[in-house]
Amino acid sequence: MGDNPFQPKSNSKMAELFMECEEEELEPWQKKVKEVEDDDDDEPIFVGEISSSKPAISNILNRVNPSSYSRGLKNGALSRGITAAFKPTSQHYTNPTSNPVPASPINFHPESRSSDSSVIVQPFSKPGYITNSSRVVSNKSSELLFDLTQDTGLSHYQGGPTLSMAGMSESSFLSKRPSTSEVNNVNPKKPKPSESVSGANSSAVLPSVKSPSVTSSQAMLAKGTNTSSNQSKNGTPFPRACPKCNIHFNLLDPLKNHMKYCCPDMINNFLGLAKTEFSSTVNKNTTIDSEKGKLIMLVNDFYYGKHEGDVQEEQKTHTTFKCFSCLKILKNNIRFMNHMKHHLELEKQSSESWENHTTCQHCYRQFPTPFQLQCHIESTHTPHEFSTICKICELSFETEHVLLQHMKDNHKPGEMPYVCQVCNYRSSSFSDVETHFRTSHENTKNLLCPFCLKVIKIATPYMHHYMKHQKKGIHRCTKCRLQFLTCKEKMDHKTQHHRTFIKPKQLEGLPPGTKVTIRASVGPLQSGASPTPSISASASTLQLSPPRTKNITAKNPAKSNTSKPNTVKSNASKPNTSKPNGSKSKYKPKISNMQKKQSTLASSNKKSKVNTALRNLRYRRGIHKCIECCSEIKDFANHFPTYVHCSFCRYNTSCSKAYVNHMMSFHSNRPSKRFCIFKKHSENLRGITLVCLNCDFLSDVSGLDNMATHLSQHKTHTCQVVMQKVSVCIPTSEHLSELKKEAPAKEQEPVSKEIARPNMAERETETSNSESKQDKAASSKEKNGCNANSFEGSSTTKSEESITVSDKENETCLADQETGSKNIVSCDSNIGADKVEKKKQIQHVCQEMELKMCQSSENIILSDQIKDHNSSEARFSSKNIKDLRLASDNVSIDQFLRKRHEPESVSSDVSEQGSIHLEPLTPSEVLEYEATEILQKGSGDPSAKTDEVVSDQTDDIPGGNNPSTTEATVDLEDEKERS
């Protein structure tokens, strides 16, 4: 026994709880119903901690065949579905195997004297049922490998052929004398069928037996036997396992309830097959050892539970409650309870005591230091569920092993210590009872104490009771979070509520002696023992046990030469599992190439499943954009490869680009990149609104979780995403300078217009009387100053005015070129004209314009054209302009045209900036245009500026054909049209 790889170590234990229930502690539902035919009639239920390097100290031990290690098993190990062998002894066994796995299976307890011979894996229905299928076993075969994958579905042994296996060397089965429970006519050269094979995966949930695919050429199917028909008629039903999490169930109803929340999409196909197999099994009372298998349960299923209590609804009273402390009246009981909690928080804030900084605001526990309190809040009172938190106590533990030890020492299966005293609703979680009270007993007289769950119906006693809990003489329950005012209340609570209230559903129908393994989580242990290849849920190896009953021990424990080095290798490569304090193992497991291939294959299978599901996804044609990364989705399978958890924070996503952006933004070394992604998509994100189409609920980007919660609560509601473009205004230096120029430009604009308009009136007289060269020279000298002044006015308003404004300035400057040097001096004298005189002058102008309209038919045609356009952008064809120019005989028009084509004109540069150049109008065109506008709008125009300009222009109009006057009038009329 020195070379035994399964030799127990003192400190190597897995993070599974192995608890032997004593006889006096057994609940009524745990007691035995019938005696087992064995030497020891003491077979309790085991809820146990399995050691990875030592056998379970129990009455049930599994046998392992030394010659048939399977290297091709994935996702767990064989369950009890094939066969089981139990040995009622507590001694340790050695393994003289010829080909052991590198990392020894945890639950294997092989027999030291097992024969190196051929095996038959075959189900059976009765003890002593012997078949002849061992005759087809070839003695020359070396080893059989079974690849049990999850893709093949459930166990099909009840209707399928029997699998045969051949050992390493040629030998036969030599059985011991069977016990009294055996049939007497046992052929010693034929193998005795056993009942189950223990799993090799202690931390991963054991799957049910799948239909094996033969991976070796030496695998042979036993044909010509009648075991299939007998098995389907008289066999015991095999334990079923959940196809997703592989938790075993002996009955169909608990499996249904489990699959409803675990994998509802697979329940129809699974239960359809399960019903067919269960209906074919009639004899369920056969007392055989296959009933004593291994059941794996989680802590949540074994220890926690809920009970609805009295379903009858309580009558609503709508009672008001008055707080005698602040004399405030609350409308219902829930608001009064919240008010009292608010009072308590205010009193704690006002009294700066050390207890306020060390008391948890959630469970009201006191801690030595504020740092420990903060650690407690972050690890326990978190929205994320961790496998190291006890929901009953609301405490977090270092490892899963410590949690399981705590559950064993302090809690019972199906314990529900938190009770609603109104309707007897019970739960293992305090938050469930509190939420139940606030929803079911709202608008009643009942007031719930958050410290001891006592219900009081009057406000004043409730407040006194509430304040008594703040005193130091309180009695805390050591097994939950409740605290009581008297010791008697605490003791009554412990005796009445800290015991099994409802048996877990998974334990219904289990025979006595069933070994139940409790685990804190489904997958590999994260904080407990170091994971080995046999622990991983993706791939593991398992050795099939020899077909023997529990009282048959094979002889010929001969070892082959190849078994010794393999045994040494297995012993050396077997890792030491972690100690209870969570320390890591000293040796790393050596993973064989076969196991690496299996893990790679398993991961590729999982990925292919996801990609296949997404590739087959039906979606509408068109462009699909991801809400998270705002990019186009070309391939759903590649864009959403898997569900990723950030290792630094609580960020989770399925979008690959969003995960990369998150890591670069928040967890990269260069924080400058943090804002690049924000700037790119912040404008789009700010304009997103989610609207529920069935109700009035809506939310923005910050309330996406609220919309998801709303849609999950209301299954029939649908959501619509409304996207609006929101301009993000970032003030720059250019914008600020424009804003500063905008105000003075608007003030300068009317002043410059008023200055220009009286200049036009003065220039009319100057231009009509002076035609000599001296006037032309004076006007050329004055031209530069006028252009400079007008250019300043136009440049200040250039950014705010439209293109037509620059044209107006251009025309104004062209009119200024015809004036003399005295125009600037006379501009200020005509600004303050009286409004009464202006009205009279407007009427006079109207009469003159009507007379001029009647004089020429050409002007009437032109006025009809202007009426059609009625805007400052009216233009004339070159032919009409040519005809109009020929009809005019005024010399000033030639000067006007000559000045317009001069390259030195500054105003021409200003007009070029507007990219639109208007042709100059003749005097007749201007007069007709002005008359038309006055007739259309009447003399009562509200524009005061236009009235002033017209009055100034009509003071000194000699003949009405001055080009400078007409140009200024056109510009003013254009401005009035724009206004």
UniProtKB/Swiss-Prot annotation:
Source superkingdom: Eukaryota
Main location: nucleus
Biased amino acid composition, Polar residues: 89-101, 169-187, 195-235, 542-584, 592-608, 786-797, 905-914
Modified residues (Phosphoserine): S104, S545, S908, S911
Single GO MF descriptor: zinc ion binding
Zinc finger map (C2H2-type): 321-343, 358-381, 388-412, 418-441, 449-469
Positions with biased composition (Acidic residues): 970-979
Record keywords: DNA-binding, Isopeptide bond, Metal-binding, Nucleus, Phosphoprotein, Repeat, Transcription, Transcription regulation, Ubl conjugation, Zinc, Zinc-finger
Classification via InterPro entries: DUF4195 (IPR025243), Snail/Krueppel_Znf (IPR050527), Znf_C2H2_sf (IPR036236), Znf_C2H2_type (IPR013087)
GO cellular component terms, semicolon-separated: nucleus
Coiled-coil zones: none
GO biological process, one term: regulation of DNA-templated transcription
Annotated Basic and acidic residues bias: 739-784, 798-809
Per UniProt, location of the Glycyl lysine isopeptide (Lys-Gly) (interchain with G-Cter in SUMO2) cross-link in this chain: 32, 34, 74, 87, 126, 140, 189, 210, 223, 233, 275, 284, 292, 550, 740, 976
Low complexity: compositionally biased ranges: 527-541
Alphabetized SUPFAM superfamilies for the sequence: beta-beta-alpha zinc fingers
Location(s), subcellular: Nucleus
A Pfam family reported for this protein in Swiss-Prot or TrEMBL: zf-C2H2_Z280C_D
Protein function: May function as a transcription factor.
Protein name as annotated: Zinc finger protein 280D
